[in-house]
Amino acid sequence: MASVILFPAIDLKDGLAVRLEQGDMARATVFNRDPAAQAAEFETLGFRYLHLVDLDGAFAGKPVNAAAVERILETVSIPVQLGGGIRDLKTVEAWLEKGVTRVILGTAAVRDPDFVKQAAKAHPGRIVVGLDARDGRVAVEGWAETSDIAAVDIAKRFEDAGVTAIIYTDIARDGLLKGLNLDATVALAEAVNLPVIASGGLASLADIEALLTPRAKKLEGAITGRALYDGRLDAREALALVAGR
């Protein structure tokens, strides 16, 4: 298996790098007023893939922080995956043309699965499905609404569609540093024939050690946010742990 990828997250709100608690836009903490500088710092530290989310875009249903994303793309040379407000093929292709490596489709995976399949067929290896769940049920529209559909049922829709990975976020843990919900994430990974990325709650080296255990072998990696920003997770220690697996 390829080494586990740690994706440092840059969530964009009003052009700033922020972290939310449980997806609540009213509970946003600004961590860097210059997201491109933050991206450059992550690259310098040795991260090999960035995870970007246009939070305003997720709520608006269209890109809002495009200028900030474009500055990041101009600044770093490592791959970037981007989600938030991407609801049609034109927007997917515009971002791919601007240098985004992988596009994350979340709400669209619930609302318009045929579009997701169309995008994955047109751009194999470049479409990721983002499943954000409360108690195993998928939330949409920037987490403002929770559906009655189980995450695993949606994931199974895309097994043979050309989707390259699933990001599974446990909303109840996101931004709270309570630790990854590895049980639910591993259960999803074992139920579908797709790589799965863990997200929500990563708090310490112990979480990364858990990613390196045999039970987590189907996980492509994990997204880390607040723990990096507030210093609970030392980037170099985390990357060294992954590199030494």
From Swiss-Prot:
GO terms for cellular component: cytoplasm. Pathway: Amino-acid biosynthesis; L-histidine biosynthesis; L-histidine from 5-phospho-alpha-D-ribose 1-diphosphate: step 4/9. It holds the Pfam family His_biosynth. Keywords: Amino-acid biosynthesis, Cytoplasm, Histidine biosynthesis, Isomerase. The active site is at 11 (proton acceptor), 132 (proton donor). The keyword Transcription does not apply. It catalyses: 1-(5-phospho-beta-D-ribosyl)-5-[(5-phospho-beta-D-ribosylamino)methylideneamino]imidazole-4-carboxamide = 5-[(5-phospho-1-deoxy-D-ribulos-1-ylimino)methylamino]-1-(5-phospho-beta-D-ribosyl)imidazole-4-carboxamide. SUPFAM superfamilies: Ribulose-phoshate binding barrel (SSF51366). It is found in: Cytoplasm. Its EC number is 5.3.1.16. Belongs to the HisA/HisF family. This is 1-(5-phosphoribosyl)-5-[(5-phosphoribosylamino)methylideneamino] imidazole-4-carboxamide isomerase. It comes from Xanthobacter autotrophicus (strain ATCC BAA-1158 / Py2).
